[in-house]
Amino acid sequence: VATLDDLVKSDISQTSQIGLMVYDLDADSAIYCHNELQTMRPASTMKVITAIAALDKLGGSYQFKTDLCYTGEIKGHVLHGDIYCVGGFDPKFNVDDLNAFVEGVRRMGIDTIMGNIYADKSMKDTARLGEGWCWDDDNPCLSPLLIGRKDNFIDRFAQKLVDEGVVIIDKDSVNCAFRFMNTHGNFVRRKPQGTYSITSRFHTIEQVMMKMLKESDNLYAESMFYQLAASTGARPATAKNARAVINH
């Protein structure tokens, strides 16, 4: 108690707002209070609440998943159909994962795609900023399909396929669809029923939570928050869904 008294009476309190409550769970009572009723912005302390709820509701073996699927059929080395990149809001998806997606396509013997490449972003709502953030804050883009924290997945995937010798031809055109490189989100569509899996990439809840808590990473925290929302079965998942899980 003396140490806490020293803290609240220190010089830092002259230029800061301090509110403390130490609560004894066994005795079900507060054992130290200082400005405990003062309204303050919770800031990154809420990441701890999100982490606890995620471990409780999702479990320690939960994995963040990104899928690569296709429709149609493969004849020879030509895919007559579309490819769907299905986002699960994995903030750790990086170049290595993208290369694995390209390798998955090549491993199936595909060297030509007679169709389109779509981003399935239906896992969550279209809100690009987290609730409570101002438009001019330095915030991450909350897209469920990111690569290297950026919302340019389809552009980079299509470019990588072309770099590896895969020809992409718009099924409605005789021209190679190099326009994929600058679609800026135009090729967004929910995958239909009956798609076939090419490959999937995973990252564990532990991997995401480590950066979320140790580095107080807002993108990782928002991603964890939306995993809770998606666990309700809502599609698209919303912040309201996540709050309901945490408050339950």
Regions inferred by a protein language model and the residue ranges of each:
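Solvent-exposed loop/turn segments at secondary-structure junctions
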Residues: D26-A27, Q38-R41, I74-K75, F89-F93, ...
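Extracytoplasmic
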Residues: T15-Q17, N35-L37, A43-M46, S61-Q63, ...
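Active-site SXXK
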Residues: D28, P42-G60, I117, R156-L161, ...
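Second-shell loop/turn segments in exported
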Residues: C33-P42, I83-F93, V102, L142-G148, ...
